Regions:
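Catalytic loop of short-chain dehydrogenase/reductase
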Residues: 96, 134-179, 192
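The beta1-alpha1 cofactor-binding region of Rossmann-like NAD(H)/NADP(H)-dependent oxidoreductases
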Residues: 44, 64-75, 108
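Conserved mid-core segment of classical short-chain dehydrogenase/reductases
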Residues: 74, 97-112, 155
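Catalytic Tyr-X3-Lys loop
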Residues: 104-123, 142, 166
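Conserved glycine-rich cofactor-binding loop
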Residues: 11, 18-20
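C-terminal helical subdomain
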Residues: 183, 187-188, 195, 203-238
Length: 238
């Protein structure tokens, strides 16, 4: 480990790593010296992120995966465990927005898909990687949330409820693992950020009026390197 590569020798895994906050966070972790496992559905998009990391002198491995498939997550956990002795950083970023609609009009099938990706997949990731996280000298789990998870907003019921449940799940995990002194949980609200999801939610918004994903990625890295407490929810403003 060196000052310019504080995560040298560490292993990180980022979900939703093909674009936006996930891609930016993966690149920031790699720039800090970590070997980053890139997880998302689209292999070609992951390869683009992998190429940028390699061109910058970093290390990355792609793992194309549909996170809505619990068995696939378990297999990924087994594959990573077979190759690496420990996991130092797990970033749970993948999510879907779904339709912004009144509660009474929420489509049950879409809501089920949304809860599967935004909540159940994250529990499955923790289940698959908890043993490997506990083998690290110090491990960090970062979960991306949203202000609507704790501040209800009209038409955001489906997405907001998934994030509210995620915050409870991760807060519970933080409480359950605090005794170890080796595993920290960070619940991160990125705030308004220039992503495809944001553009879909606010189509009339000027993209340059909100911060780029890189700002969020740098804040996440800074938190990982700091003496931050476990279970804390933080909001990242520009």
């Amino acid at each position: 480990m060196t000052d310019d590569k504080p995560l040298s020798g560490k292993l990180a895994l980022v979900t939703g790593a093909s674009r936006g906050i996930g891609a930016a966070t993966a690149e920031a972790l790699a720039a800090a010296g970590a070997h980053v496992i890139l997880v998302a559905r689209t292999a070609s998009a992951l390869e683009e992120v992998e190429d940028r990391i390699h061109e910058a002198g970093g290390n990355a491995t792609i793992a194309p995966l549909d996170l809505s498939e619990g068995e696939a997550i378990a297999k990924l956990g087994a594959a990573v465990t077979e190759r690496w002795p420990a996991l130092d950083v797990l970033v749970l970023n993948a999510a879907m927005l779904g339709s912004l609609t009144p509660v009474q009009d929420i489509d049950p099938k879409e809501y089920s898909r949304l809860l599967t990706l935004n909540l159940l997949a994250n529990q499955a990731m923790i289940a698959a990687f908890d043993p490997l996280l506990r083998k690290a000298e110090r491990a960090d789990v970062v979960a991306l949330t949203s202000s609507v998870g704790s501040e209800p907003r009209a038409f955001w019921g489906a997405y907001g409820s998934s994030k509210a449940a995620l915050e409870t799940l991760l807060g519970t995990y933080a409480d359950e693992t605090e005794y170890s002194g080796k595993l920290r949980v960070h619940i991160v609200d990125p705030g308004a950020t220039r992503t495809r999801m944001r553009a879909n939610a606010f189509p009339g918004e000027e993209p340059d009026s909100v911060k780029p994903p890189k700002v969020v990625a740098e804040a996440i890295l800074e938190r990982l390197l700091a003496d931050a407490p476990t279970g804390e929810k933080v909001r990242i403003d520009a």
